Swiss-Prot record:
Residues 450-459, 478-492 have a biased composition (Basic and acidic residues). The gene is Tnfrsf8. It is found in: Cell membrane. This is Tumor necrosis factor receptor superfamily member 8. It comes from Rattus norvegicus. Residues 1-18 form the signal peptide. One of its GO terms (biological process) is cellular response to mechanical stimulus. It is a single-pass type I membrane protein. Receptor for TNFSF8/CD30L. May play a role in the regulation of cellular growth and transformation of activated lymphoblasts. Regulates gene expression through activation of NF-kappa-B. Residues 160-178, 339-360 have a biased composition (Polar residues). Induction: By phytohemagglutinin (PHA) in spleen T-cells. Very low level of expression. Detected in spleen, thymus and lung. Highly expressed in HTLV-1 infected T-cell lines.
Length: 492
């Protein structure tokens, strides 16, 4: 029992040590504006006043705020941020205040190539114009000379002309002698000349800054303008003597414009300069090849599909003809009805003069070969009930067909005579055991089967047509005759 108590005590002490000992009490910061809720919302943090910065993430009072160049900015998180100092090579643009940081920029003569927030990460030197741009050449820029202004800049800073920039002013042509030259200029150039003439300011003439006049040759105008430029620190003179109202640079400007105009007329213009679109022969050749390939493949597939369709149609047509016109075995009803009637008549007719019934042939006597007319012969039942003369007596089942192995039946020749009687060759029949013909004895059957073997009229010998149904005929003499010949069988 004591061991259990000790174990419970140790467990209780471990649980007490698991709780934090210096956990602050939960407070609310709604009453005091100088405090704001901390990140965990369990305590309040002191809000540093303007000009003070906190010394810890969550200051607890004024003692934790210190006075320095640190800026206390009230942002969205209500935290204080420090003021930044400008890096070497940067100058202060705007000082640090209670609600805005310090803004730094590059020194004079430099420009910011990599901007940063309220500062610049990399400054690069500015360039000035070394050679101005012409109709054939772009502006050539260079680093400023040591004699430049204090800020390291020059009025002719290197700038790339774009569609949004306004071109430099061109002096107006006030001399009547220059009307013919003005007519050669395009309308846009004359408009720019008229607009820029109002902005020109006359500068006193000086011999050192006076630019030399170009040579009369238009081809040397560009060289004169390029090589003879005033020093970088001076401004070229754009005016002449007081007696003349035309600027000194008018002639050179006009010569340049006329030269550019005439050269543009004489030289063939390219599609890129005129702005007209043109087709690349490489891409056109590719698209033409693709179109030809697509058309060829489509035509090949269509022809192949048509050939396959014709082949399938022929195959399906043959199959349809085979299924539609397939020969079928003729049934009992397909045989001529009159032949069946004649068969019934020949088997049941009685001789009125003799007064006795003719004995019918046994089933083996009418059997033929297996290959000719077996369908109709097998389906024709022998009417044995008609022998007794009772048409309403129950019909006995037909005799099973006797195979050729148990009989020696053989019809040698068939002769068709002009008389009503058909004579057939000798027929020998083996009667199955245990069965005798009804209404006759063996002697009478042998007497009836004795037939004349002498052939008659061999020229009338016929053969049964192929595909015809085998006909079994029993020819019976009419009732008025006295000669009672045996019933004969014919097979066509």
């Amino acid at each position: 029992m004591s061991i259990l108590l000790k174990a419970a005590g140790l467990l209780f002490l471990g649980m007490l040590q698991a709780f934090p000992k210096d956990r602050p009490l939960d407070t609310t910061c709604t009453g005091d504006l100088s405090y704001y809720p901390g990140e965990a919302a369990r305590n309040c943090c002191y809000q540093c006043p303007s000009g003070l910065s906190p010394t810890q993430p969550c200051p607890q009072g004024p003692a934790t705020a210190r006075s320095s160049v640190i800026l206390t900015t009230t942002n969205e998180d209500r935290k204080c941020t420090a003021c930044v100092t400008c890096l070497p090579g940067l100058v202060e643009k705007a000082p640090c205040s209670g609600n805005s940081p310090r803004i730094c920029e590059c020194q004079p003569g430099m420009y910011c190539s990599t901007p940063a927030v309220n500062s610049c990460a990399r400054c690069s030197e500015k360039t000035v114009v070394k050679f101005p741009d012409t109709a054939e050449k772009n502006t050539i820029c260079d680093l400023p000379s040591p004699g430049s202004g204090p800020n390291g800049s020059n009025p002719d800073d290197c700038k790339t002309l774009t569609s949004h920039t306004t071109p430099q002013a061109i002096p107006t042509l006030e001399s009547p002698a220059n009307d013919s030259v003005r007519s050669l200029l395009p309308k846009q150039v004359t408009d720019f000349v008229n607009e820029g003439a109002t902005k020109l300011v006359k500068v006193p003439e000086s011999s050192s800054s006076k630019a030399s006049m170009p040579s009369p040759d238009p081809g040397n105008a560009e060289m004169n303008m390029t090589l003879k430029l005033p020093p970088p620190g001076t401004v070229p003179d754009i005016s002449t003597s007081e007696n003349s109202m035309e600027p000194a640079s008018t002639a050179s400007t006009l010569s340049l414009l006329v030269d550019a105009r005439t050269s543009s007329r004489m030289q063939p213009t390219s599609p890129l300069s005129t702005g007209t679109p043109f087709l690349d022969p490489g891409s056109m050749l590719f698209w033409v090849a693709m179109v030809v390939l697509l058309v060829g493949s489509a035509s090949f597939l269509l022809c192949y599909w048509k050939a396959c369709r014709r082949r399938f149609q022929r195959k399906f047509h043959l199959n349809y003809l085979q299924q539609t016109f397939q020969p079928k075995m003729e049934q009992v009803d397909s045989c001529p009805t009159e032949k069946l009637t004649q068969l019934q008549r020949s088997g049941s007719v009685t001789d009125s003069s003799a007064g006795h019934t003719l004995s019918p042939l046994s089933p083996p006597a009418v059997e033929t070969g297996a290959s000719v007319g077996t369908a109709c012969l097998e389906t024709l039942p022998l009417l044995d009930d008609s022998i007794t003369g009772n048409s309403f007596a129950p019909r006995e089942p037909p005799e099973p067909r006797v195979s050729t192995e148990h009989t020696n039946n053989r019809i040698e020749k068939i002769y068709i005579m002009k008389a009503d009687t058909v004579i057939v060759g000798s027929v020998k029949t083996e009667v199955p055991e245990g069965r005798a013909p009804v209404g006759s004895t063996e002697s009478e059957l042998e007497a009836e089967l004795e037939v004349d073997h002498t052939p008659h009229y061999p020229e009338q010998e016929t053969e049964p047509p192929l595909g015809s149904c085998t006909e079994v005929m029993f020819s019976v003499e009419e009732g008025g005759k006295e000669d009672h010949e045996p019933t004969t069988v014919s097979e066509k």
